């Protein structure tokens, strides 16, 4: 049972770190402003779009205290939804730090004891989420997007009305698709790296040909 704890911690770290990185990777959204023609579809200037997007990202930081201040109008339901989103991201950021600490403590101990199997287990375990998510996205991104919101939120406040919450016009579904794809790629990359490290260590211990990077 103890040998499952470390791979689970590593997997939790990889998933949460990938999500936190994507949340804070603002260049992705800045690129989408032009590639998705958000200025034209929303009717707002790039400065206004960036200002409100940056306010959302700053608000979702675990260190942020206070209310969300947008230059765009916002309904009561919209504000509640963003509060719900912040709680989720706060949990993710805390989970990221705690799982990293746990992974380092147990990982260093396992490494010193000569145990490398946790790398293989974590590599395999961390693949499941992106595979499932990838299948859902490939099958129907719209339904996957709706399913995610229905699972994560206990209300329907995420169904914005652009007349009362025009911020939805600067957050197209395609942007969230790009975020999902980036998270999947990061998780798969981490899984691949762990798998390669495991194979290299296995070859080294068996005296076989060395894997080089």
Feature locations, PLM:
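Short extracytoplasmic
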Residues: 42-61
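Juxtamembrane interface at the cytosolic side of transmembrane helices
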Residues: 4, 100-145, 193-213
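Terminal transmembrane helical module of multi-pass membrane proteins
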Residues: 159-205
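Hydrophobic alpha-helical transmembrane segments
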Residues: 34-47, 66-76, 120-139
